[in-house]
Each structure stands twice: as structure tokens, then as C-alpha cells.
């Protein structure tokens, strides 16, 4: 249909889903430089160790590594600079209240293209305990064993 935008996932933060329990997800735009967009499209972005914070009514993304392209030359960007996330004011106010709760944080989950726009799925998350992680691993292994047995 006309007007539908395709969604192409560029980077997926799989580690976040293992280490955190995701309570809510939000879709946010990113304020990027031109060289950063080119580098992201080339697959040079990394969401590991990235997190977001709310500072003076703005949501900022820290530690997202976007390696510059070699062709950027003098126009190369700082790979670890702080980037602003573009959310609606109502969403920011809602997140501000939720993040102030004990143990909740904002974690980037996916970086994707929606049409020509680079967007980020942001998750409101609570850290998992070690026994929760072990439980997830056990469930995954039993599921894998069952699938193997079914194939035989």
C-alpha cells in the first residue's frame, strides 16, 4: 500500500534481552550527523553497553558506538558521542516517572531503518538476577532438546 514504510533492522541488542527484563518499549528517532547515518547504513553501529538517561527533559543515548567510515576523512564524527533521542513530550514525561522507580533503566534494543529514517527501539527495563538468567538458559536448552527430538 502507498504510505507504508518498510522496516529494516540494522543492529539488534540481543544481550539486553538476556540481561534485562523488558517492561515497555518505545520507538524513538535519533539526532544524527550525515556521516553517522552513512556508517549505520554500512553496519558499523554497536549497541552493546549503550544506555539512555533523561537529562533536563531530553532523552540522551550514551555509549552507542558508531565507527566512522574511512572515506569521511576530516568530517569524521566522534564514535562515542552522546546522541539525542527524539520522543514526544508525553512519552518523555511518562518515562521520567518510571525511570525514577528503583531499578528501572532505559536500554536500546534495536536500531532500524523506517523508510529513510534511522530509529531506535528503547526498552524500559529491570535488571535480571543471576538465577533468572540461569532459568532462561535452562528453558532455551530444553526447548532446543525437544526440537532435536522432534526432528529425529
UniProtKB/Swiss-Prot annotation:
InterPro entries: SmpB (IPR023620), SsrA-bd_prot (IPR000037), SsrA-bd_prot_CS (IPR020081). This is SsrA-binding protein. GO terms for cellular component: cytosol. Gene3D superfamilies: 2.40.280.10. Its main location: cytoplasm. Required for rescue of stalled ribosomes mediated by trans-translation. Binds to transfer-messenger RNA (tmRNA), required for stable association of tmRNA with ribosomes. tmRNA and SmpB together mimic tRNA shape, replacing the anticodon stem-loop with SmpB. tmRNA is encoded by the ssrA gene; the 2 termini fold to resemble tRNA(Ala) and it encodes a 'tag peptide', a short internal open reading frame. During trans-translation Ala-aminoacylated tmRNA acts like a tRNA, entering the A-site of stalled ribosomes, displacing the stalled mRNA. CDD domains: SmpB. It comes from Gloeobacter violaceus (strain ATCC 29082 / PCC 7421). GO terms for biological process: trans-translation. PROSITE patterns: SSRP.
Amino acid at each position: 500500500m502507498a504510505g507504508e514504510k518498510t522496516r529494516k533492522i540494522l543492529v539488534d541488542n540481543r544481550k539486553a534481552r538476556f540481561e534485562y527484563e523488558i517492561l515497555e518499549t518505545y520507538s524513538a528517532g535519533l539526532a544524527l550527523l550525515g556521516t553517522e547515518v552513512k556508517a549505520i547504513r554500512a553496519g558499523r553501529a554497536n549497541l552493546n553497553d549503550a544506555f539512555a538517561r533523561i537529562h533536563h527533559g531530553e532523552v540522551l543515548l550514551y555509549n552507542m558506538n558508531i565507527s566512522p567510515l574511512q572515506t569521511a576523512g576530516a568530517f569524521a564524527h566522534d564514535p562515542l558521542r552522546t546522541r539525542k533521542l527524539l520522543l514526544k513530550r508525553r512519552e518523555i514525561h511518562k518515562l521520567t516517572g518510571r525511570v525514577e522507580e528503583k531499578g528501572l533503566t532505559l536500554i536500546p534494543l534495536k536500531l532500524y531503518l523506517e523508510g529513510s529514517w534511522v530509529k531506535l527501539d528503547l526498552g524500559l527495563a529491570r535488571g535480571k538476577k543471576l538465577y533468572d538468567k540461569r532459568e532462561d538458559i535452562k528453558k532455551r536448552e530444553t526447548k532446543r532438546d525437544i526440537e532435536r527430538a522432534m526432528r529425529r
